[in-house]
Amino acid sequence: MAPTIFVDHCILTTTFVASLFAFLLLYVLRRRSKTIHGSVNVRNGTLTVKSGTDVDIIIVGAGVAGAALAHTLGKEGRRVHVIERDLTEPDRIVGELLQPGGYLKLIELGLEDCVKDIDAQRVLGYALFKDGKHTKLSYPLDQFDSDVAGRSFHNGRFVQRMREKASLLPNVRMEQGTVTSLVEENGIIKGVQYKTKDGQELKSFAPLTIVCDGCFSNLRRSLCKPKVEVPSNFVGLVLENCELPFPNHGHVVLGDPSPILFYPISSSEVRCLVDVPGSKLPSVASGEMAHHLKTMVAPQVPPQIRDAFISAVEKGNIRTMPNRSMPADPIHTPGALLLGDAFNMRHPLTGGGMTVALSDIVILRDLLNPLVDLTNKESLSKYIESFYTLRKPVASTINTLAGALYKVFLASPDDARSEMRRACFDYLSLGGVCSSGPVALLSGLNPRPMSLVLHFFAVAIFGVGRLLVPLPSVKRLWLGARLISSASGIIFPIIKAEGVRQMFFPRTIPAIYRAPPTPSSSSPQ
C-alpha cells in the first residue's frame, strides 16, 4: 500500500512541475513574440515579417504632407515609421507654389528653413491679364514680418529638404517601400503591409496609421468615400532665362478657353502651366500638342515672354498632369486617418494644396499633443473625429475658392458666364478691399468661408450693377438675373459637397469641443 501511495505522490509532483515549467515556457514565448522585432511567419511560400510594437505612428507617403508630418510628430517625441514608395527627389509640375498662409504654417512647424538653399523665389502677389489689359494684386502682408511672403520652387528640392530634416530625428525611421494594404482587425486598423525596395513582404504595426500617399492613393477607399473629378489637365513647360512682366509675382492669363499660369521656380526658370479643359489632350508624341501650344496658346501669352514660351515648346520637354478635385468625405476608422491629396484635393489653379496640408498638420499636432498613449483607441478615435471637423473652415474655404475661381475664369459662350468673368477681372482691378479681400482668401491669410461667399456675390452684384447703368433694359435685366443664377450654380454645389454645417457652423458639431484627456483616459485600457 505504501509503495502505491509513494508512486502516486511522485506522479502528482512530476505532473505539477511539468505543468509549471510548460506555463513558464509558454509565458516567455508569448512575451518574446510580442517584443522581438522581426518574428517570421511563412504562409503559402510568402515571407511576412511582423515588426514589434516600437512604433507610435506609421506614415504612408513622404511627399509634402508626409515629410512635414513626420518631422512634426517626431519632434513631438513620437516614434514614427515613414514608408515612401520612392525616396529619390520627385520631379513634378505642381506643388511648386506655397502661399503666404502656408508659409506661416511652415514657420509654425519649424520647417521654414526648408525653403532656403533651394533657389526658392519670393512671391508677393499675382498679375492678371485679360484681353490686353492687366492688373496687379498684392498680398496683404503689411501686418507680418518682412520674411513672410509666398514661395515658389522646385517641388522635389523642397520635399527632399523636409525628408532630410525628418530623417535627422532619431525617432523617425524613413524607409523606401510600397504599402499594398492596411492591416485591419475587428474594424480597427492595426498597421500596414508593404513591400520593401528588395521585394520583401513586411508588416508594420502601430496604434495610428496616417495615409498621405498623394493624389493617386490606392488606400483611400477604405478610409473615405472618394468622389474624384478631373475637370481639366495641366500642360507643363519650363521657360528659361526670361523675365516676367511683374517680378516676384504669379501671372494668370485669362485665356481662351481656360487660364494659363506663369510663376518663377528658380532664379533662371519660370514654370508655365496651360490648362486644357476636359479629359482629352492633344498627343505630345505626335507633335499635336506642340502645334496646339504654338498656334492656339502662344498668341495669348504676354509679349514679354512669348518668345521664351515658343522656345520652351520647341525644346519638347512637354509634360501633362490631370487636375483632380475631391471633397473630403471621411469614413471614421479607428486607428487610421487620411491627410494631404490622398484625402482632399482641389483644382491647383490657386496653389492652395500645400497650405491646406500644412494647416491640417498643425491641427493634428495640437490634437494629438495631450494624448500621451495612442493605444487607447476610443480616445484616439474621438480626436480623429475632432480633426475632421476642425480642419473644415480653412480647408473648405480654400477648396471652394479654387473650384469657383476656376469655373469663373473659364471662357464660355454663355453671355451670363462671360459677364461674370469680366466682372471678376474688373472687380479685382478696383483695388482696396475689392482686391485685398479676395487675395487674402487666395493666399490663405484669411481663409474664412463667409468672407468668400460675400466677395463672390459682390462680384456678381457688381456685374449686375454695370448692366443696369445708365438705363436698364429688359434684355439687360434678364442677363443680370441669369448672372446671379450662374454665380449660384457655381458656388452652391461646391459648398454642398464640402458640407454646409461643417464649413459655416462647425461650433454646432459636438466633436469640435473635445477637452484634453485626463491622465486616466489617455492611459491604455
Curated annotation (Swiss-Prot):
Tissue localization of expression: Expressed in seedlings, leaves, stems, inflorescences and siliques.
Subcellular location: Membrane
GO molecular function, a single term: squalene monooxygenase activity
Cofactor(s) it depends on: FAD
Name of the gene: SQE3
Domain of life of the native organism: Eukaryota
InterPro entries reported for this sequence: FAD/NAD-bd_sf (IPR036188), Squalene_epoxidase (IPR013698), Squalene_monox (IPR040125)
Gene Ontology BP terms: response to jasmonic acid; response to wounding; sterol biosynthetic process
Enzyme class name: oxidoreductase
Site keyed Important for enzyme activity: positions: 126
Residues given in the record as FAD binding sites: 64-65, 84-85, 92, 163, 179, 341, 354
Protein name in UniProt: Squalene epoxidase 3
Known EC number: 1.14.14.17
Transmembrane spans: 9-29, 452-472, 477-497
SUPFAM superfamilies linked to this entry: FAD/NAD(P)-binding domain (SSF51905)
Lineage, opening ranks: Eukaryota, Viridiplantae, Streptophyta, Embryophyta, Tracheophyta
Family per similarity comment: Belongs to the squalene monooxygenase family.
Entry GO terms, CC: membrane
Keywords noted in UniProt: FAD, Flavoprotein, Membrane, Oxidoreductase, Transmembrane, Transmembrane helix
Pathway stated in the Swiss-Prot or TrEMBL entry: Terpene metabolism; lanosterol biosynthesis; lanosterol from farnesyl diphosphate: step 2/3
Pfam families, per the entry: NAD_binding_8, SE
